[in-house]
Structure formats: structure tokens, C-alpha cells
């Protein structure tokens, strides 16, 4: 608000003014100029007048007499405001705007009173003089405010005290000197109300636009606040879900620990019982040990446990038995083999169904049981059959030099150095040779970043994982790898996979690479031209599989060996645990059901006495389900 100077006051008296002057455009533009022009588009309230005028706006009081404006007494204020509102409505006729309030009596909560079409506020002392505000509302939302002071009152305004109007506001803008610019001259009521009516009419359109923008802004802020509250509620719900999943994870880990503890107890008990069985087998229940069975002239007093042998073979790729015999596993021409060398030099060998860990473990068990029972003659290998494999000679390129370079002797098994160069401690011991990185067009160029390490004997899965090595298969093993994939993940969908290879070759390559890396995590997938050869081998294997399905061969003869009911249930349990390892689900109910089925599988393995040899598979399935729960938790928080 502008400062008021009583030297510029004037007298407004009732009288006849035939042509009262209207507000000019220049006068209106002057009011809309300056930093406080926004006050013209903000309606006023008694509370805001009291806050700004009574407390924040200074008034210059002078020693001269205050000139009379609209004057009345507190007792006659009702009639005075009625007359003023009536005159204002006459000037507003035809503008579509009307003045005055139809309220009467006290206004709730504000302490004001509605009289004569105006709302009268409470009197306050300003610089020692009592001041009384009044607001006349307009129908378009604007307000006209009039400020009265009482020159006769001391501390409080009584009914007989004189009230003098000395300041006018349109909305929040002080328009006193626009409404009554004739300093020192008398003005009629018609002149004042004409000026106020003109200002209200000129300002109405801008006021309505400003109020519309203000309402839109307020609605937007309200909506944003509601959205913020909704998102906070959603975050709170997600936090509760995270806490619930964490609790489920803790319960699962506790159950896994309980199963592991129980497995340890069973392992110790099995060790004790196995020792008793071995002792009884050696002595026949007598203190004097009878001669053990002979194979090739050497005693076969074996005290080894099959689970222990499988574990050592998995970790080291070889194992030494208690009677001095040795077992090892290796891959030749893409086929998996288990070899047992007796202390007398006899060699026994069995071929695994595939190079996958489960099939290799089955072959280990079959050969060991036959050897322990003395029925191993069918696996005897003639000397010429188990000679060391001939290493394919590397054809040296003709460099034009008169003296040929020495031929490098390399091992039969090649492993890509992915993460670090060959150095002591960086690769497993026993390597035959280190080859440089192949040319860029080589199928394994991307894998062998630091060259290729070769070995005469295959490395175990654990060694390849610990040293970040990848077995580089040769082209002659592609058919075997493709056949293994066909019997594995592609078995149920051979026909559809073959159609995909024909209709969408690119998608088939992606699917083949994904399943290859999942089935053979420690074997490199060939790139470049090698990819096309691998794809062709896979197509050939799928075509053969589809042909076998179309024209099935006669069922093979049933083996003589009968499987007990407990072993049959254990086999089903092992198959289910393998399927759990491939499970990819975001359904909490499905995962909970899987957890219950895993517990039933554990019980089946324990009943058949095969829990220990499949303990790693059980733990892997439990960890996989726990990882699925954690993935669901992370996905929920990101959302």
C-alpha cells in the first residue's frame, strides 16, 4: 500500500453532479504500472488489511487539521454504508457487476460485522489514532476497501464518535488519489462512486484472468501434493514388502542351515557305518581278515566312499583309491571319459553319456562299483586303445627362411586366458605350452585375450572357474556338443527349435548361444565362422532328433538290474532339483511351493541314502530359490 499524507485529504459531500468524470485510460495504466501492479488482481480481506495496514504500512500524520472525507458516526455507519453501496450500484448499472453483501450480523471466526452491505472490521490504534476498516464485496470477486479514522475517539470508538473515510483500495491497490485527485477541493459522492465503478469495470477482465490462473496453479499444487502423498504411501507399502521378503529370506537361510547341520550329522553317521561295513566286508565278521578278492593279481581291499571319490574327481579331476588305483576324468573329441588304472597297470575306461557334470558323476559311480565288485573286465582297455592321444601337429607356415623353426609341442586341451596373462600362480600347474592370442578371424579371438594355455589332461570345472579359463572345443567336437544340447534343453522343443532355425536364423543363433553358455558354463562358444558350423551341427542334431520322434526305434531291452522304490523316488527328486536350477519365476506362491517340494526331495534322498552325493545339488537349488526372492524384492523397490 502507498503511504497516506493527510495534507492531500479532501471533503466528499452529498450533492448534484450531472456529469461526474470517469477514470481515464492513462489513470488506469498508471495504477497497473510498477512492481505492485499485481495488487490490482488480488482481492482483499479484513484479515489482510489488518495485517498489512495496521502492522506493516506507515502513515504520515501531520500537525495540520485532517480534512473531512466521507464522515459519519459509529451509530450512523449502517446508513452511511447503505447510501454509499446504493450510489456505487447506480454507477455499476450496465456493467454486469453489483456491489454489497447480503450478510447481516456477526461474521464467524473473523470478529467482523456485516452491516449496510459491507463487512466492518474491528477498530485498532494506529500511531495513536483509532482506525476502522470496511470492505464492500463486488459480484465478480473484486473488493473495495474503505479505511475510517476517528478524530474524536481517545482509546476506543464509541457510538457517538465521528468516523472519517480517508483511504480507498480496489482489491489490494491504494486508489485514493485516483478516485479523488482534486487535492483541497470538495468532491461529491457521485464522483467518488463513478471513479470506483469505472476502475472496477476496467479491472474486471484482468482480475478474472488472474483468478483463473491462480485457481489453476492452486489446483496443480493440490494435485502434486496428492500425488506426493500417494507415492509416499506406495513407498511405505514397498518398504513393508521389503521387510517381509527379508524376513522370508532369513527364514529360508535358517532352514538351509538346519538342513546343512542335519546333513553333517548324517555324514558323520554314514562315515561310521561305512567303516563298519568295510570292516565286515574285509573280515566277513571274523577277527582274522580273509584274503581280499584279486584283480590282475593285486589285492582290491577298497575302503573308499563313492561320494568322497566323486567330490575329489569334481575338484581335482582325479582321485587315488585306498588300494593304490587311480581314477581320472577327461574329455576327448567332445566325449566324456572316466579312466581307472589298477596298481598292476591294467586300465579300465567307461564313456559318459555327455560331458555334463551329472552324467560324468554317473559314469564315475558305475565304473567304481564294477571295480569294487570285481566285475570290471568288460571295461578293460587294450594297451593300444589307451595310448596318449596324438597331438595334432601345428603346420608351420613357410616364412622363406632357410632354417626351419623348432616345432612347438602343445597339449591336447586348449584353454583361453580371459582375464590375465600366463604367470606362476595365474594358471593351474602342469601346462604343456602357452600359445599367443589367435588372429582376429579365429572363432575364439574374443575369449583368448591373453593367449591360450594347453594341457595334456583336462582341467576340472573348479580349476577353470577359479582361474577364469574357458575350454576351446575343436570343430570335431561340435556334433557331440550339439547332441548333448538336443538331449538336454532342446529335447522337448526340437521341432519348434528346428522351425525357428529355418524361419528366424538370427533368433535361433541367440537362443543357441544362450543355452550353450548355460549348459556348458566353462566351454567357449565359437564365434565368426565357428558359429555357423556350430549352428549347422545343431540343426543336424535337431533333424536327427525329430526323425527319431517321427519314427521311433523299438524300445531297448529292459536292464536286468531292478530299481528299488526308494531309488526311484530319489531319481525323481534329483530330476526335480535340476529343474529348480532352471526355474525363472516372479510368482511368490510358485516359489513357496518349490521350497516345499525341495524339502520333500531332501527327504526322498535321505530315505534312499543318496543325500550326501547330491548335497551340492540340494544347496544349489535352495540358493537359487533364495536368489529369486531377492530379485523379486529388488524389482519391487525399483518400481
Swiss-Prot record:
InterPro entries: DarA_C (IPR041501), DarA_N (IPR041140)
Coiled coil: 201-284
Stretch list, region Disordered: 382-407
Pfam families from the UniProt entry: DarA_C, DarA_N
Induction: Expressed late in the viral replication cycle.
Record carries keyword Ligase: no
Tagged with keyword Coiled coil: yes
Other information: Phage P1 Dar antirestriction system is composed of Hdf, DarA, DdrA, DdrB, DarB and Ulx. Hdf and DarA are incorporated first in the procapsid in a co-dependent manner, followed by DarB, DdrB and Ulx.
Name of the protein: Defense against restriction protein A
Annotated gene: darA
